[in-house]
Amino acid sequence: MLAAGLVFTRTARSQDSAVHYIDYPGTVGKVQSLPWDGVPKWATLDVQLRGRLEGQSSDNFISGNGRAYLLTRNYVGLQVRPTKFLTGYIQSIDTHALGLPLTYVAANMRDTFDDRQAYLDFHMKNMHVIAGRQELKYGGERLVGISDWTNNSRTWDGFLGRIGDKNRLDVFSTSVVAVHPTSLDTHGAGLTFHGAVGTIGTWVPHMAIQPFVYIKSFPRVQSQQGIFGTETITTPGVEAAGNIPGGFDFDGLIAFQRGNYSNDSVVAYAGYIKAGYTSQAAFLKPRLLGEYDYASGNTRKDLTKINTFDQQYPSNHNAFGLTDLFGFQNIKQERINLDLTPAKRVTVLLQQEWLQVASRFDNIYSGSAGTVVKAPTTGLLSDDIGREFDASAKWAINDYVVMNVGVGHFSPGAAMRENGHGAPLTLGYMSLTYRFKVGHKGTASAP
């Protein structure tokens, strides 16, 4: 939501995406460096502190069921560099939802002092092999990302191999980590998420291209006919983003899915396109962006076939509005964004979304792929999910402390109102984030 464009990372490590897109609401501001000779030259400590006050008017679409609570998150990490070819990193997480009854605490809100990351990075020139608990995030993070906005951001256990820098190839075999609020976080049995992601950063001027293929597999699922079996879904696709002379920018993704879900076959697809224009010379440096999103839904024309797109492991915050009510499954969206820069350290975003289901015979899904509204056998009477208006702002108070504020208002459409989800919802938030690192004076930076 800052100035339009893309930023290529300079160092290859497991936390890095090949390309960071400005529309993902990541953390802005710098990491404060605090030199201390008491820390060995081969080690660096890093800390991130974040608190976010949230309030909403009608939790679970129940009128009058308002909630206000404080989400706190602390990361503490330690990087060690015992040799020229080996780096180790471990990071703890401690998150809480203060003021919220446990019955309302979601799985992504609370994790009492746990291990978030722990990996070894064997590296030589532009080659890396990373083993352990690590982050995965690619492109706009619409299919694979850490979901940093949530209190418990996502990590994976497994292996990642990387060769190259601005033009590179990543290959990984992992299993997503399941958060257990009061015990150690674990992953499922076996490695269940695999992928290969290429990054083409210099072949086409002013453009980054990421072809990818992801494979999601589970040993036991139940089909639409109630038959148990294995799941294997392959998701090939490509994402591209770039700047066009004259102040224009774009970002687009297309993905297809084929595979099996027990005895059912999977045939699904999804994509989005964004196109924007920024006037650097005008007052407030306005940037106008148009966006269209589509993810297929089950048509029920063939009861042995599943057409619902599997959203994989996305960063869904603000993908379909600030209220984060819906996911990238059985959905269509038209959106208009207006970014403004009233001051050097302040950005403002205004946006309007219109949401519909792709198929009236499939459910309406949440950001975590759960069911918000279950479609009756005869299908939903309307495809209108609703519309939302959002206003948000970021203020870098200084180089190291960043404030985020925002409010989103969702107005349910006929598909929601006719199925017991008719209460409008307003959500507001205010957050502060501070990051710093401690290391021996003159030594290498931490992650």
Annotated model-derived regions:
Residues 13, 396-423, 436-442:
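C-terminal beta-signal and adjacent terminal beta-strands/loops
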Residues 55-72, 82-126, 138-149, 222-224, ...:
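Surface-exposed loop and membrane-interface regions of Gram-negative outer-membrane beta-barrel proteins
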Residues 190-193, 313-341:
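Outer-membrane beta-barrel signature, preferentially recognizing the C-terminal barrel domain
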Residues 19-20, 423-447:
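Outer-membrane beta-barrel "beta-signal"
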Residues 27-31, 57-62, 101-103, 141-144, ...:
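Extracytoplasmic loops and strand-loop junctions of Gram-negative outer membrane beta-barrel proteins
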Residues 16-20, 125-129, 147-302, 336, ...:
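Signature for the C-terminal beta-barrel architecture of outer-membrane proteins
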Residues 52-56, 85, 95-97, 136-138, ...:
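Structural signature of outer-membrane beta-barrel domains
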Residues 3-66, 77, 81-83, 284-292, ...:
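N-terminal periplasmic/intermembrane-space "pro-region" immediately following the signal or transit peptide
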